[in-house]
């Protein structure tokens, strides 16, 4: 509960000029040796109707003088207790500190408000649970170099502490402290300064790092592989896209080799690649292009590398195709196709590798991206004996319609050169036939055509099976026509096994009475027919 007087003191903003010193003293609005106190707004006070101070500055002054009443008033006017503690420390008013100690909380929160190193250290001493390391760490954070200098001899005895303070100074970007530690103390791991500088893109800290590195090399006879270190820095700077950092490193030596430019490409920093690309040999540029493909670099980076090679990549076509297929990175294929001159079409080469090694999903994506016909892919799949691909692509391309699929696969068989590929296509045709329930009267014409197809391609077992299936449809006249037609095919193409199967079916039809001796004689009158069948059985009948 506030007294009426305290409520007035807290909220009164305008004082009558007629109030004398005695009245102001009774109201608690008089500051000895300074004059009347008047609140202005929320953050300022007017002293003796003339001087304006911030509430916190006035609070610091009052605490320094040990004026408890004014301190109490200014705290009532929402002054920050931390400034009272600072003032008390400046005036050695420990009685006042003791009075408010329980309200202070964490004394470390006061430290950022202090500029004087001595007061800073005295304030830190208020935290009885802290040690010298805590003081030094806060001295680094708040740029109190003189405190570090004061305790230099003590710091020097603890190498781990030196490293902690150095790393903290780097992270806090306190360059003056970093420089002092670098020149005055032994730093075990100097690399921290470069790590922090690169992480925060702090060029001034990075430059300071090299200053300290050269000092360390020249004064400590340190066993440091500077060349290797410079390459690491170049690689890290390239990965971060920090060209100015790379140029700074190059002042001390180092070389922008392919590993450095690999990093720039991996992290998509084209400008760095553009700056150095003309300094590396053609073979390195070729390797960079392959790396760009593998990391799926953007269009501008690929164009930069291709342009540097004058779009001539014939020496690395195999590696390029392999990289495109393995890393599913097809942009370079498009760029090479877009050229008016020196156009290079890698679609077939990439597609062949995809068909050989990659999944159906990858292949479909490529087909759609480059508008590749399904027939083209199926022929490649047949050469590589990838039955599953043939089936899946056929279903997707021709809407899983059996007759349409069979029709297109039959057409492909005629142009398929490797016999193994042709056999696989015929196998797929028969597989579709067997799994699609086509053995119905409505499909009679298509089965007839398929049987003649098997005969033309000397597919013996499948021909025999489909003839048996066709006979089961109970179309005797058409079956006779099929058999006679296929016999003619067998004789013309010199397929003795097909002719033998046909001969068996003809005998069967003859014994059933479905074909006459005259019809058989006419069929067997073909030139060289006697080479494929034995006509004695017919003569004996």
Curated annotation (Swiss-Prot):
InterPro entries: MGF_505. Induction: Expressed in the early phase of the viral replicative cycle. Pfam families: DUF249. Keywords: Early protein. Plays a role in virus cell tropism, and may be required for efficient virus replication in macrophages. Belongs to the asfivirus MGF 505 family. This is Protein MGF 505-10R. It comes from African swine fever virus (isolate Pig/Kenya/KEN-50/1950) (ASFV).
């Amino acid at each position: 509960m506030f007294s009426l007087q305290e409520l007035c003191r807290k909220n009164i903003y305008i004082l009558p000029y007629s109030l004398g010193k005695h009245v102001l003293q009774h109201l608690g609005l008089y500051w000895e040796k300074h004059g009347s106190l008047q609140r202005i707004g929320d953050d300022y006070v007017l002293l003796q109707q003339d001087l304006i101070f911030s509430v916190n500055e006035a609070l610091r002054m009052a605490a320094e003088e040990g004026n408890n009443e004014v301190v109490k008033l200014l705290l009532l006017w929402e002054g920050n207790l931390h400034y009272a503690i600072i003032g008390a420390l400046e005036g050695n008013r420990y009685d006042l500190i003791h009075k408010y100690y329980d309200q202070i909380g964490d004394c470390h929160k006061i430290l950022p408000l202090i500029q004087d190193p001595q007061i800073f250290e005295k304030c830190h001493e208020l935290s009885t649970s802290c040690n010298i390391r805590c003081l030094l760490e806060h001295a680094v954070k708040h740029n109190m170099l003189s405190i570090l200098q004061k305790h230099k001899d003590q710091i020097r005895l603890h190498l781990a502490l030196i490293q902690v303070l150095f790393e903290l100074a780097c992270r806090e970007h306190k360059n003056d402290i970093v420089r002092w530690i670098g020149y005055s103390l032994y730093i075990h791991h100097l690399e921290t300064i470069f790590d922090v500088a690169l992480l925060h893109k702090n060029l001034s800290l990075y430059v300071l790092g090299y200053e300290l590195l050269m000092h360390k090399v020249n004064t400590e006879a340190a066993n440091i592989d500077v060349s290797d270190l410079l390459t690491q820095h170049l690689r890290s700077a390239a990965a971060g896209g920090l060209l100015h950092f790379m140029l700074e490193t190059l002042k001390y030596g180092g070389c922008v080799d392919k590993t450095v430019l690999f990093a720039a490409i991996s992290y998509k920093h084209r400008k760095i690649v553009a700056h150095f690309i003309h300094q590396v040999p053609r073979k390195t540029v070729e390797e960079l292009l392959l790396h760009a493909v593998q990391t799926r670099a953007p269009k501008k980076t690929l164009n930069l590398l291709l342009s540097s090679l004058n779009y001539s990549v014939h020496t690395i076509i195999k590696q390029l195709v392999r990289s495109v297929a393995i890393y599913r990175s097809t942009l370079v294929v498009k760029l090479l196709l877009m050229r008016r001159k020196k156009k290079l079409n890698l679609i077939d080469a990439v597609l062949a590798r995809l068909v050989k090694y990659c999944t159906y999903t990858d292949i479909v994506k490529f087909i759609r991206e480059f508008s590749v016909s399904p027939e083209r892919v199926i022929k490649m799949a047949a050469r590589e004996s990838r039955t599953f691909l043939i089936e899946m692509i056929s279903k997707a391309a021709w809407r899983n319609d059996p007759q349409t699929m069979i029709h297109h696969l039959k057409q492909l068989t005629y142009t398929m050169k490797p016999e193994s590929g042709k056999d696989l296509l015929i196998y797929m045709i028969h597989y579709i036939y067997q799994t699609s329930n086509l053995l119905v009267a409505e499909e009679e014409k298509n089965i007839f055509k398929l049987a003649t197809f098997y005969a033309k391609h000397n597919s013996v077992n499948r021909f025999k099976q489909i003839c048996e299936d066709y006979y089961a449809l109970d179309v005797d006249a058409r079956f006779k026509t099929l058999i006679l037609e296929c016999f003619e095919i067998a004789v013309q193409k010199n397929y003795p096994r097909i002719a033998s199967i046909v001969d068996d079916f003809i005998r069967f039809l003859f014994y059933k009475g479905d074909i006459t001796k005259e019809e058989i004689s006419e069929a067997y009158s073909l030139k060289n027919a006697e080479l494929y069948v034995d006509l004695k059985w017919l003569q004996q009948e």
